[in-house]
Amino acid sequence: MSTLVMPDPFSGIESFPLLEMDYFGLTENQLNKLPPKQRLEEMIKIIKHSDDESQRWDSICLCGELYHVLDRGDHDLSNVDSLQMKTHIKDLFRWILKNEKNGVVLHEVCYHIAARNIRELIPDLVTCGVCSDSILGRHEAIESLGLMNAQEVMDEIRKALDDPVRDVRETAEFVLKRLRRYKNETYEGLQII
């Protein structure tokens, strides 16, 4: 049994050489043809270094799908490899919530956190929902907390009732109503068919 030896994608980020734009020309289909470990490494590089938000968005979608496959155990990787890759994806999603400037990309990562029920990132979603410069990001972070039935952060979500943007306030109102209705329910993540 081999163990995944994957360099820490979050150390020495500033030391990465500037990569050729052709490198970032990888499409979703090309990335999907790579073995899972290599695919994750490439997606991390794209998310951290591409100036094309559509490429970062694609990579987030693929990371979410990969997380889902790893979580289900429907793969040929060892448990150690699978756990390590899931940890890298969670760390990457947390990094995106803190660093992404594009609202559409931020929206997408919030969705994938909720769809995969990555509860360790609830505090990061709260921060995004209350503090992000992106209206779209604040909206989706709050909506994602509602989808995840994050009862434990209702007080923090209430802060968004004072958001200067009507759509964000409406999202907070909606989510708080939903959380009250689902108080005794458990969220298990979206089922991907």
Which ranges hold each PLM region?
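Intrinsically disordered, serine/threonine- and proline-rich low-complexity regions
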Residues: 1-25, 29
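Amphipathic alpha-helical scaffolding segments comprising HEAT/armadillo-like alpha-solenoid repeats
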Residues: 4-7, 33-47, 69-99, 118-130, ...
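HEAT-repeat alpha-solenoid elements in large eukaryotic scaffold proteins
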Residues: 12-23, 54-75
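Alpha-helix N-cap/helix-start positions at coil->helix boundaries
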Residues: 52-54, 102-104, 134-136, 166-167
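Boundary/linker segments of alpha-helical solenoid repeat arrays
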Residues: 167-173, 185-187
